[in-house]
Amino acid sequence: MKAVILAAGYATRLRPLTDSIAKQLLPIGGRPMMDWVCDKVEEVTGDIHVVTNARFAGDFGRWANGREGVTVHDDGTTSNDDRLGAIGDIAFVLDRAGSDDDLLVIAGDNLFDFSLSDFVEFWRTKGVASAVTVYDCGDLELATHYGVVEVAEDDRVLGFEEKPSEPRSTLVATASYLYHRDHVPLVGRYLAEGNPPDQPGRLIAWLLGHEPVYGYRFTGAWFDIGNPEQLLEADNRWRARLGHPPRETYSTLS
């Protein structure tokens, strides 16, 4: 299995912090966010590909130094205006690293409690299928900011709607995906058909019309870090786990 960790965005909502530091390298609980994500990914594979942009490729290269099995890919973009988009970045890595294996895709700015080993075990029981992690956010207003999924009793995903104005449920897709090796070439087909290259949930929505996709429900902590409030909340949650006092404002200092 290959893993692709998405870290090529420009995190404009976190400026000025992200003018000089990639969001995924900001410290959470005293460690770069990517450390926590990569620790999780290493539960299931040692073939890890991090895709980032030209602005921060050197920083990610230094971060990866000493981490066995981690390859950093520079997608060549330099600003939010010329970014490839998450799905474009997945295709970029597959072109460089090959597309002949099962694929785990995970966002580098998502922190969570569940075990990726459990996610993989769940997915392997479904045969030739892909899977997405799903979480009950518990609030219809909050659900408008995410992709809302409809899941059958057997866990098969029946529907997906990206950021609906009137969500039908509070069950949302989170940014962890497993693609069977037979489905991986469909990433290129999705893009070749002219579909949007951003928001990986759109790929799942498209895939539903072609192949079976299952939803893995999880509980516990989950942070999709996109703004200063979420960054501070995640930092304080991880600091508390380490026995450190909470902060009123976020700081990159330990």
Predicted feature residues:
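Catalytic-core segments of class I nucleotidyltransferases/pyrophosphorylases
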Residues: L111, V120-R124, E153-D224, P228-L253
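Conserved donor-nucleotide/metal-binding helix-loop-beta segment in metal-dependent transferases, i.e.
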Residues: F114-A143
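Short alpha-helical oligomerization interface
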Residues: D19-Q24
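Conserved N-terminal catalytic core of the sugar/cofactor nucleotidyltransferase
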Residues: K2-I5, R13, P27, R31-A107, ...
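Short, surface-exposed amphipathic charged segments that create phosphate/polyanion-binding patches used
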Residues: L84-A91, H145-V148, Q230-E233
